[in-house]
Every structure is written in structure tokens, then in C-alpha cells.
Amino acid sequence: MAKRLDLTDVNIYYGSFHAVADVSLAILPRSVTAFIGPSGCGKTTVLRTLNRMHEVIPGARVEGAVLLDDQDIYAPGIDPVGVRRAIGMVFQRPNPFPAMSIRNNVVAGLKLQGVRNRKVLDDTAESSLRGANLWDEVKDRLDKPGGGLSGGQQQRLCIARAIAVQPDVLLMDEPCSSLDPISTMAIEDLISELKQQYTIVIVTHNMQQAARVSDQTAFFNLEAVGKPGRLVEIASTEKIFSNPNQKATEDYISGRFG
């Protein structure tokens, strides 16, 4: 668990459109890395390349290297499904299977892998729900539909589903954007706990959230409309928010643009 990610000279294209240019960065194990920047700067595009989710879009391609420890996830013969198992994703809006029970939501990935042993499934459901700080709230209604939970509970259910398959990395695409402040606090507390076991990358538009939950922060920006997004700088979150190297970073953090 908790592997390192390294990007070297990564360029991302959709057909002939150059979406992101020349990204090189290291994402350390058992830490939280935040991607920040204005809309359209490429931060979510980069996030999705980390587990090849962008490939669902026709014409998408990546140049450069993305290494999970020492394994290039884009090397010939690498199965994208295996990549997504090792590098899980939590999306912007909670997306549990609404008619499926809470228990079956959590173990859906294991069942897709062919696991049928009831004890293994039940034990995994409990451990994953505990890991997502949801067990005490749902342990007496595991057979009720996941769609009946509150928004914040649904997002934690999605996190439980992601960790049930024992990934090395968790990607989170604005996981609190549709949640109320109390639910957001619960997710942020959970992120701080999960980083003890997982490598976490989070995209957020909330500067305060990035400052609260992350160990390092990467700032992305656009040179101009129609130009590719670029990584401006990456450093410890303390440095990015107190003394960044680039004026563009300071301007964005201070709210002068974006």
C-alpha cells in the first residue's frame, strides 16, 4: 500500500488539442498532495491520467512517463483495469449504486474480481466502512439502499467502496464540492486519517481546504485561452501558502485571479 507516483515530462492530448504540457512532479507515499488552479488549467485532467480514467474520452493520449513506484502505468501490456484497481478514484459528486444495499455497494469491486466468499465480503464491508468512519452510522442497516444515505454519508460510502479493493493510491476530484460544511469537515478529518495508509491526491477549488488537508500543493495555470495547462510550481503546502516562488501562485492564492 501507499506507493509513490512520479510524472516525468507528461503531455496530455485530446485528439489534436494539447490539454496539458510538460508536467513533472513527485507524489510521495502516505501524504496528501493538493492540485489547485483556476478552472480549465488541467488539474483534473492530470488527476485522471494518474489512473488512466481520461482514456474513456475518444482520442485521449499521454506522452511522457507516469510511474507507480517503478512501474510505468502506460507501458505496453499494462491493463488499465488493474491500474484503476491500484489507483482508486472518488468523484466530485457521491455516486453510490442507489438501489444496491450499503453492504453490496462497498464490496461491488470485490465481486467484480470474482470474490464470492460471504465471510470475506462481510469482513471487508465492515473494515472498509470503519476505515471510512461510517460503520457506526450504518451497521444496523447494511441491507438498506445506499441511495438513502445523506450526501456526506454517500461520499464516505464511496470512499469505503474505493478502499475495499485495497488500492495503493486514492484520487479525489473535489470530493466536498457538493457537501455541506459539517459533511465537508467529516471528509477532511477522514482524509487526514487515510493518509496514514494511502497516497492521496485531491483536486480542490477551496484554498482553505487545500491548506488544511494537504502536505504539498501543486499549482496549475493556463498561459492563455487555447493554450495547454501547465504546472507552475509544487512545494510544501506551508511554502505555497506563505512564500511561493512564482508571482502567479501568490496572485491565485490571494484571490487576485481565478
UniProtKB/Swiss-Prot annotation:
It is an enzyme of class 7 (translocase). It holds the Pfam family ABC_tran. Keywords: ATP-binding, Cell membrane, Membrane, Nucleotide-binding, Phosphate transport, Translocase, Transport. It is found in: Cell membrane. GO terms for molecular function: ATP binding; ATP hydrolysis activity; ATPase-coupled phosphate ion transmembrane transporter activity. It comes from the Bacteria. Residues 5-247 form the ABC transporter domain. It catalyses: phosphate(out) + ATP + H2O = ADP + 2 phosphate(in) + H(+). GO terms for cellular component: plasma membrane. ATP binds at residues 37-44. The keyword Transport applies. InterPro entries: AAA+_ATPase, ABC_transporter-like_ATP-bd, ABC_transporter-like_CS, P-loop_NTPase, PstB-like. Induction: Transcription induced by phosphate starvation, no change in protein levels on phosphate starvation (at protein level). If bacteria are starved prior to growth in phosphate-free medium protein expression disappears. It is a peripheral membrane protein. Its EC number is 7.3.2.1. CDD domains: ABC_PstB_phosphate_transporter. NCBIfam families: 3a0107s01c2. Part of the ABC transporter complex PstSACB involved in phosphate import. Responsible for energy coupling to the transport system. Belongs to the ABC transporter superfamily. Phosphate importer (TC 3.A.1.7) family. The complex is composed of two ATP-binding proteins (PstB), two transmembrane proteins (PstC and PstA) and a solute-binding protein (PstS). This is Phosphate import ATP-binding protein PstB 1. The gene is pstB1.
